[in-house]
Amino acid sequence: MTTNDQILINQILSGDANAFTQLVNRYKDLVFTLALRMLKNREEAEEVSQDTFVKTYRSLNKFKGDSKFSTWIYKVAYNSCLDRIKKNKKYLNDVEINEFTEHQVKTVNNAFDALVEEERNQLIQDCLHLLPSDDSFLLTMYYFEEQSLDEIADIVGISANNVKVKLFRSRKKLASILKDRLEPEIIEYYERAN
């Protein structure tokens, strides 16, 4: 756990509301992104994000510091999403993910390179959106949030080896979707060139 997180947690436990605001601001984008990945609905993701921070506040005294605080709050968010999915008994698939892509596009000097990078990221985001929630969540945690296998295992409640196997399968599914998406574009490109 970072020293800054521990300082904020101690301040919150001492009754400092401003410290909780700082903690929320530090993790709100990450929690919302994970909720949006799993629920695939903006309004649901916003509600679950709020629920996550309410639950975090209420149970902050139970946080022991055995893992990173980010891992702990991801687990709270993950479980809140699972609760919401069970409550709705359906996966909601009607919202595109744009904010996450905007944050991930790197600044480049050449406008053409930026456009190519944006299109590539959008394609990956679109394909991630087509995956089941669990696969999308695992790939997001590992590649975009840079969580370790052990941290992901702690969040989802399975062993690190199982996470590794699930990541492998998720990557294969993503590769298959990408291949299906890219082949028609490549064929169309070469047909236009002739």
Roles of regions detected by a PLM:
Residues L13-S14, K40, F53-K68, K87-N88:
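Sigma70-family region 2
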Residues N61-K64, K75-V95, E117:
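Arg/Lys-rich amphipathic alpha helix in sigma70-family domain 2
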Residues T2, Q11, N93, L123, ...:
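C-terminal edge and immediately downstream basic/flexible tail or linker adjoining helix-turn-helix-like DNA-binding
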Residues L13-Q22, F32-D51, I155, A160, ...:
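Short, charged helix-capping/linker segments at alpha-helix termini
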Residues T2, Y91-E117:
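Internal acidic/polar
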Residues T33, E47-V54, S67-N79:
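Structural recognition of an alpha-helix C-terminal capping motif at a helix-to-coil junction
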Residues R26-D29, R37-M38, T140-Q147:
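Short helix-capping/turn signature of helix-turn-helix
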Residues L82, I124, D135, F144, ...:
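DNA-recognition helix of helix-turn-helix
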